[in-house]
Amino acid sequence: MEIVTKIAPICLALIMLGLGLGLSVKDFTRILRVPKDFFVGFFSQLVILPIVALGVALILNLPAPIAVGLMIIAAAPGGVTSNVLTKFANGDVALSISLTAVVSLISIVSVPFVVITSADILGVTISSDISMTGIALKMALVVTVPVIIGMIIRGLAENFISSKINIINKITGWLFIIVFAAIWIEEKDNIFNYLAEAGLAVLILNIVMMMLAYLIAKKFVSGIAQQKCIALECGLQNGTLAVFVATLIFDDIAYVVPTAAYALIMYITGFIFIYILRKSN
């Protein structure tokens, strides 16, 4: 897992820099204008998603590393991908960006809490050298700091950055591919065995969570565009961040595998979900 451990933080920092380049202060202040829509998405992603993931892990009686890996991907925020697919689905892109931005920044606290708490529940021992504070500080260096730097750069050269945002999104997409290609290459002898163990769990989590988030949003938020956005935000996670956290805490590739499986499945289910919504509308 040596290659993945080395490239994951670099790629994640660059991806978060790209996210920051696409953000402005209005993406944070916007939530004050539509607090209900934001809160429903925020609560669904930050609270309900990890609870559903824990339920899936316990019901399927997953091996401990796979179960904790599932919790890591469930704790991860949405990424640029969720913003892109929300646009493709004619969802509320502004709300999607706000959710991604806020949940990403909060993730330096929420992710360590979810992972360490769930590991304790699932009977997984974490090294005494690993603390919630230590994880949060390391995450801040590769998540929060790059986002802030990106926002500062955008503020200094907004017109130029705005004209290049599509290129920036494509670059971040390739960085995502590089990380997961490294996982497959480095663990090519074992990857299919791991995927066989994790595949059903991540498929169930992804489908159940998108459907549940959509139903919750349908009950509480203002319109169909917001409902699509919240469902996709809860179904499309920042896989690179999840890989970074998994390699930061654990030495076993098994903890990373649910992330790799989820990254494959979420695109397929995401597009199927969008297709169904378009047909129904």
Language-model features: locations:
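Alpha-helical transmembrane segments of multi-pass small-molecule/ion transporters
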Residues: M1-N281
